[in-house]
Amino acid sequence: MPRYRITIEYDGRPFSGWQRQDNAPSVQESLERAAEKLDGAPVLVYGAGRTDSGVHALAQVAHLDLAKDLSTDKVRDAINYHLKPDPVAVIEAARVSDDFHARFSATRRHYLYRMIDRRAPLTLDRGQVWRVTRKLDAEAMHHAAQALLGQHDFTTFRDAQCQAESPVKSLDAISVSRYGEEVQLTCSARSFLHRQVRSMVGSLVEVGVGKWSARDFKRALDAADRSRCGPVAPADGLYLTAVDYPGPA
């Protein structure tokens, strides 16, 4: 059976998350349903990142095995046809070897978190960005965020329901920048804990609005205590933007 790697974009708002769940719509279920209509038999789709309810993706990666040997353009276009009207799109499809696994072969995952600091309600970006009603100091947030680089016990920024065996992770890159009224955080790591990015963002916003200093933020990280985390940022502003794999880009 040929194996295909697909790159996927989706609006996370209508979904309970990536992972298939009983009695709740998921991105995985939408893709598997569409792939089954193409292949004529049940198809399992494996994703690189199990995004939470409401979290978006610009370039989620998944793989699937089909009984039919189809061109990559046919796979992309046919799955997109059967996905309608769900807000999910296959941007690209490629043939890969049988040992490729979207989740376990990944070497790095990249996330973006979008914030807008304004008093007025959102209209065009509603559900796609976090509106913070106080002015954010993006430079202070960036400075504080550098404490997260490298290997740490991220218990403070780990959801209480996280099932990972260890809270220790290595963060490869993190940056906070302002673009007009929008503040964007980007970060990269091999893997993340459950709600780690949203927890880090929520605590950095405490720095951005002047409630915490960079030292307060570092102390919260070092405490390795979930109760020291600031408010968890909403899912609205979070996007999985890319997944890296070994070999040529």
From Swiss-Prot:
InterPro entries: PsdUridine_synth_cat_dom_sf, PsdUridine_synth_TruA, PsdUridine_synth_TruA_a/b_dom, PsdUridine_synth_TruA_C, TruA/RsuA/RluB/E/F_N
Residues that bind substrate: Y111
Job of this protein: Formation of pseudouridine at positions 38, 39 and 40 in the anticodon stem and loop of transfer RNAs.
Keyword Nucleotide-binding appears in the UniProt entry: no
Protein name, UniProt field: tRNA pseudouridine synthase A
GO molecular function: RNA binding; tRNA pseudouridine(38-40) synthase activity
UniProt keyword list: Isomerase, tRNA processing
Organism, as annotated: Maricaulis maris (strain MCS10) (Caulobacter maris)
Catalyzed reactions per annotation: uridine(38/39/40) in tRNA = pseudouridine(38/39/40) in tRNA
SUPFAM superfamilies (UniProt xref): Pseudouridine synthase
Domain of life: Bacteria
EC number of the protein: 5.4.99.12
